[in-house]
Amino acid sequence: MTIKNVIFSLFILAILAETVFSQNCMDTSCPGLKECCSRWGFCGTKDEYCGFFCFSGPCNIKGKSYGYDYNVDAGPRGKIETVITSALFDSIMSKVESNCSAKGFYTYEAFITAFKSFGAYKGKVAKREIAAILAHFSYGSKSFCYKEEISNERYCSKSKKYPCEPGKNYYGRGLLQSITWNEYYGAGKHLGLPLLKDPDLVSRSPEVAFKFAMWFWNRNVRPALYLGFGEITKRVDGRECGNWRRDDTKNKVKQYIEFCEMLGVTPDQGLDC
């Protein structure tokens, strides 16, 4: 092989490596400090990367909504304990049926403690976001009726980083029961909790249940708030989008609108996914 061919081959490999990197930027981030990762997983510095559809990086989304009010992080704000008071929380939980296994499990104290354990919620929070969180938590637990998935599958993958504990199952527990598999229970590493060794801790402790769900929300959902309720629904459980589970999507949107009305705010316009 000539030197010219070697140089050409290295050039092609560099391009391929850059392409592969950019296509996975939602997992690996972009190589350049000035680059943005788009919601489709590509890196760049132009408006299609850093504008309205920016996922991470130095996003510039102000004025990029193209006339639509999509931002779930917009509108009236307040501290979590003033937006959701003890009386309002009790009113929501009073609708839980007496035959529900989680009746009385989800408490106001656990709710507030879990929220305030994340820096983003120690100050004022958009009421829309709180409404969206409640809608997803309510839907994910069947209106706060359950604290664990009815179908108790094992959901164990061969992960060296988050190995399964012998005899333990990693099915959905808590408020977002679409969160399954041992990798997600690896959240215990970030929460300071032994969730891989003791996944049932999520269904034993209301505070842990809220923290587990809030960890997922902060990590996977919150970066997309400006894209609308439909987009964050896709990030919680993409199976609900499209034509496969339209009734599920409609019911979740209905709950979001109801919680928005309860908090005195208008929902965003990006409801569908």
Swiss-Prot record:
Glycosylation sites noted in the Swiss-Prot or TrEMBL record: 99
Protein name from the UniProt record: Inactive endochitinase At2g43600
One function term, GO molecular function aspect: chitin binding
Lineage top rank: taxon: Eukaryota
SUPFAM superfamilies with a match to the protein in the record: Lysozyme-like (SSF53955), Plant lectins/antimicrobial peptides (SSF57016)
Annotated Chitin-binding type-1 domain residues: 23-61
Key words, A-Z: Chitin-binding, Disulfide bond, Glycoprotein, Plant defense, Signal
Signal peptide feature range: 1-22
